[in-house]
Design a protein with these regions (language model features):
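Detector for outer-membrane/organellar transmembrane beta-barrel domains
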Residues: 171-245, 271
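N-terminal periplasmic/intermembrane-space "pro-region" immediately following the signal or transit peptide
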Residues: 2-73
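Outer-membrane beta-barrel "beta-signal"
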Residues: 41, 260-262, 285-299
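Transmembrane beta-strands of outer-membrane beta-barrel pores
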Residues: 78-84, 104, 119-125, 144, ...
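Surface-exposed loop and membrane-interface regions of Gram-negative outer-membrane beta-barrel proteins
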Residues: 90, 107-171
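Short loop/turn motifs that connect adjacent beta-strands in outer-membrane beta-barrel proteins
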Residues: 59-71, 105-115, 130, 145-152, ...
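Residues that define the transmembrane beta-barrel architecture of outer-membrane proteins
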Residues: 70, 92-96, 113, 132-136, ...
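Membrane-embedded beta-strand positions of outer-membrane beta-barrel proteins
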Residues: 74-76, 100, 115-119, 140, ...
Length: 299
């Protein structure tokens, strides 16, 4: 009788231990763990066009965003001059400049990189004897946005096309570029390096180095109005500089500007100049100091 009671007690203890062990070791495919993984993944899913959400650790997420879930933007601008790296492309006349871009979502929450394609255009004027009427640029590249969009990068390609230009002038060319930037809050800085294996007008190898600092003005009197100032400086090197129409193989350009954004419309006034005098700029004033006003809107 005593042995029977001891056996029953041992059996009950074994059943209790087994039940405790089962509750403590939930299977990896159980609903509880699956719900936790879904919630964790949702918390770390980035908004399209933004960097990944800040979390303590990333889940083993391998899903890539759909290729057609991106964003389309269109910008329309009008300016009193089209200045390309300090040199007027319209002989100081008005320019109209539309731009269209499609950007994909970021690849994943752990790889905040997106791809983009687009086109940008402007009227140009190179003189009465030159039939070129417009520049149309085709662009493509990869963009990085990390650290809550504070760190940005752009690895891009531009194909410059000049409508109406005779083929034997070799105006069309390719350019590759890398742009890096960081937003410190009180100021944003950007730097770029651009390379062309054969620049405008068959001018050979060309390099352009550029830097810019933008400072938002903290004063606000309306939530729909914002101000900022910026300064930029660049250096252009051209191998066969005479083909490009300048007097030496490199020059500097710089500008200082002020932008007011009013209900989504950007109004910019900029002072632009180069170190190229008239004799070194094809005996024109296209490289001289000037003020350029631009109005633009992005949709």
């Amino acid at each position: 009788m005593v042995l029977k009671k001891e056996a029953e007690l041992a059996l009950r203890l074994f059943i209790l231990c087994a039940a405790s062990a089962t509750n403590a070791q939930t299977p990896s495919g159980s609903p509880n763990q699956q719900n936790a993984e879904v919630q964790n993944a949702q918390a770390q899913t980035p908004t399209p066009g933004q960097g990944p959400a800040q979390t303590t650790e990333a889940p083993p997420e391998k899903k890539w965003n759909a290729p057609f879930g991106g964003r389309f933007t269109a910008t329309f601008a009008a300016a009193t001059d089209y200045s390309y790296r300090g040199i007027s492309q319209t002989q100081r006349q008005v320019a109209f400049q539309p731009a269209f871009t499609y950007e994909t979502p970021t690849i994943s929450e752990t790889v905040p990189v997106s791809a983009y394609v687009g086109a940008w255009g402007s009227n140009v004027y190179f003189g009465n004897t030159n039939p070129t009427i417009a520049e149309v640029d085709l662009i493509a590249g990869l963009r990085l946005k990390a650290l809550n969009d504070k760190l940005t990068g752009d690895l891009g390609y531009i194909r410059y096309n000049y409508l109406g230009a005779p083929a034997d002038l070799f105006y069309d060319f390719n350019e590759f570029g890398l742009v890096l930037g960081y937003d410190f809050g009180v100021a944003q800085i950007q730097g770029a390096v651009r390379y062309s294996p054969n620049f405008f007008a068959n001018a050979g190898v060309a390099w352009y180095k550029w830097g810019q600092v933008t400072v938002p003005i903290p004063y606000t009197f309306n939530e729909n109005v914002a101000f900022k100032i910026y300064g930029a400086v660049g250096n252009q090197y051209v191998e066969r500089f005479t083909n490009y129409g300048i007097g030496n193989n490199n020059y500097w350009d710089w500008q200082i500007g002020f932008t007011a954004t009013v209900y989504g419309v950007d109004l910019t006034i900029a002072y632009i100049d180069t170190n190229l005098d008239v004799p070194y700029c094809g005996n024109t004033m296209n490289c001289d100091a000037r003020a350029v006003f631009t109005i633009s809107k992005t949709f």
